[in-house]
Amino acid sequence: MVSSKEDERSLFVSGIVKNKDKYLFLVKNPEQWQQDENGRLRLPFGTVESRVAKGETAESALMREFKKEIGTEVKIVNSETSHFIYNGQVDEMNMNARNNKPLFVYKEEKIEEDRRRFDYIYSFLTDAGKFDDIRPLNRNAVVLMNRDLLKKAAKGKLSVGELKLRGGRIISEIELPEDALLYPTPSSKGLYLCGRCH
């Protein structure tokens, strides 16, 4: 039985980048690829995400991670509405902050070694400049997809090959297997769930 005394909380921020009709996501590096129950390779993808260090602001945490992962600067854009997502349920929430309002807060529960952990991911709309200037670092791959492709990927049904055939784009120095499925992390799934892509 997991007791409340053993609960842990971690705070993350993520940056949602959109240029014209496409969203930008990172495919995690090969060490984090996994196979599903049918032996098919799954490539986790999500927004640029960072754990917030003690004394750090959301914007500085995002700035640090964007420079590390894709070598670009980022600016938070205030969202008109904010959503709270937990267990697949989406609720609009009131945020008193005038600046740096997130598009959504995704609460994820994990149990590891009899310890319950809650991750809170604050996802912000951001401006990261032109996609032409973006280059993946740290063995990640950048994928660009429109909302229709994101809907399919959020359900775990989009392969790398189909992404290319249907107008998506991959920027990478590593080869992504054509038949591998793009698998959503909470930040990319949250973008789909909060209605931004409906």
Predicted regions: what they are:
Residues 1-48, 74-78:
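N-terminal strand-loop-strand
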Residues 62, 66:
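Hydrophobic alpha-helical positions that pack around
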Residues 32, 52-53, 82-85:
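Short, catalytically relevant binding-site loops at active-site mouths
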Residues 71-131:
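Active-site segment of metal-dependent pyrophosphate-handling enzymes
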Residues 18, 67-70:
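Extended cationic-aromatic binding surfaces that line active-site or macromolecule-binding grooves
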Residues 51-61:
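N-terminal phosphate-binding loop and adjacent alpha-helix
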Residues 39-43, 108, 112-198:
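Nudix hydrolase/Nudix homology domain
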